[in-house]
Amino acid sequence: MELPIEEIKVRKVLDSRGNFTVEADVTVPNGFGRTSAPAGASTGETEVIAFSKSGIDASIQFFESKVKRSLIGFNALDQSGFDKLLTDIDGSGNFSNLGGNLATALSMSVAKAAAQSLGIPLYRYVGGIRSTIPRPMGNVIGGGKHARNGTSIQEFLVSAQGSTFLESAYINVLVHRRIGDMLSDKFKDISIGVGDERTWSVNLSDEEAFEILNEAVKEISSEKKVKIYTGVDFAADSLYENGKYVYKHTTKSRDEQIDYAISISKDFGVYYIEDPMYDTDFDGFAEITARIGDRSLIVGDDLYTTNPDRIRKGVEKKSTNAVLIKVNQIGTLSAAREAVAVATFAGMKNIVSHRSGETTDDFLAHLSVAFGSTFVKTGVIGGERVAKLNEIARIEECLTS
């Protein structure tokens, strides 16, 4: 069956931080797809390049002059072929000409257009009969590169295990609110800020943040009679300087960082631990996983950057038991799907994730279902975050009706 691409348009739009990003429209017979690409603040060294080194306008110009003509008429049902064509025309190996964000927008828009033409939802088109609804994982206290004057650890996370996805998402909101009240009581004369992902941001030590997080979780869990997991994203690359991990009030050696990551599981009951080590330290990750992987998820984000080859290396070294998936880290839906397949075959869980600079696009909601994700990491509040949460709630309704 052929489904020729009839038209493609790309444009600049704004993301949730007010920065320019790209949006792509793809038209096929009886189908249309539109995708706006997100952007990260904390990015891995091995991610594809978001835009041409000359900027977003240069990426768009490269598309118009070098790419568009080759895509018109291409069979939209051949997703892997389309994505390979994007990669080949770019020719750089890391999308430094077209830009990984524009590649992501194009790749996802083709999938959306094909799904609409076939009359099926995107999650079904990408994932087939798979119909696992993930649990929402949302950040409630922020620091690192996502918030000024916040904690050294970039994200403190919660995931409620309610009877439905929407109930779970709402309980995460209640934890967020309770933490806001607690911080207002603790810092009566200081204005409490919010970070890029609508987390609370204030000059706290990491230990104080753990205490407040656990107190809020305990209270809401008791009130709602629901289990609530806690988690962190160390974003250790942003802490790493000259072989050390530099926090606000202390500096840790590699061995001390490993011990610290292990201790938060034991001392604070943290279940989800993302990027506890620098992104080349596969062995450091492996030591943490070997010691606490039976009771905690050790998640690779910057370690893997959704790159199938890096995930294969992690599998070989037993570095983690879970992987974060972000399409615009690797540039195409096909490559992200391969990353999930490699991880799943090795028995690793996957978590589909947003970026700090988001849009109201909801494609990651569909991917989290299509990929059978254990969690979907997409914040707690804010229109660009809630757009994904509400879409998963709608998908759950369709699957259970």
UniProtKB/Swiss-Prot annotation:
Pathway: Carbohydrate degradation; glycolysis; pyruvate from D-glyceraldehyde 3-phosphate: step 4/5
Active site residues per record: 197, 326
Enzymatic class: lyase
Binding-site positions, (2R)-2-phosphoglycerate: 154, 326, 355-356, 377
Cofactor(s) for this UniProt protein: Mg(2+)
Primary subcellular site in the record, as a coarse category: cytoplasm
Reactions listed under catalytic activity: (2R)-2-phosphoglycerate = phosphoenolpyruvate + H2O
InterPro entries: Enolase (IPR000941), Enolase-like_C_sf (IPR036849), Enolase-like_N (IPR029017), Enolase_C (IPR020810), Enolase_CS (IPR020809), Enolase_N (IPR020811)
Cofactor note: Binds a second Mg(2+) ion via substrate during catalysis.
Binding site for Mg(2+): 233, 274, 301
Compartments where located: Cytoplasm; Secreted; Cell surface
Protein family membership: Belongs to the enolase family.
Protein name in the entry: Enolase
